[in-house]
Amino acid sequence: MTFASLSTPTTAAELRYLALGDSYTIGEGVAESARWPALLAQQLRADGIAMSAPRIIAQTGWTTDELSAAMDAAGPLGEWDFVSLLIGVNNQYRGRSVEDFRSEFSGLLTRAIQLARGRTDRVLVLAIPDWGVTPFAEGRNRANIATEVDAFNAVKRAICASRGVAFVDISAVSRKFGGQPTHLADDGLHPGPALYLEWARAARSVARARLPGGMGREWGGE
């Protein structure tokens, strides 16, 4: 999929949302409206929070350093009311070291906090899902994939805790549903709309506690 840096005009009252990531953020294989950042924004609006549609800087296959380079290339990104970050699966997939990831992820998180006007409470990080449960991993060592993904996520969790940034662990729900055809895109690897909805629900409960606004109706995905 081609690089995406998408945005929707906002009104003065809307909170500006920047979503940073890779294929999981751009929503490889699903419609734009089914991407988890788009679903999260919809859910937060249902809660009475004036959230804009997200600007997305993401591309399938990106590693931490490639996302950072793309942010540089995007020019001045300005300031945002809310920033999400989901990155790292391609570092693991390509066999890159956890130690290199630690340094690069820490740098990305610093940038995300800066983009959120220095407010750590306005940054949200999602865990890397375990792609080893998907049909794409057939013939591979699924146990090793799970162990490696857990190691990368442990780094993310620890860095977020040290910075006071929310870490949303989607590991359990991804392992529960990530291998089911009803929750997969056609490629047998990436999540489908149903799984992205689960991710958005997990992120919603964390995000809405950190954003100004009221509580609205419960989101049923309609």
PLM region spans:
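Alpha-helical cap/lid subdomain in secreted, periplasmic
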Residues: 50, 69-221
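Serine-esterase "nucleophile elbow" of acetyl-processing enzymes
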Residues: 3-60, 70-79
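Active-site-proximal substrate-binding core of FAD-dependent oxidoreductases
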Residues: 66
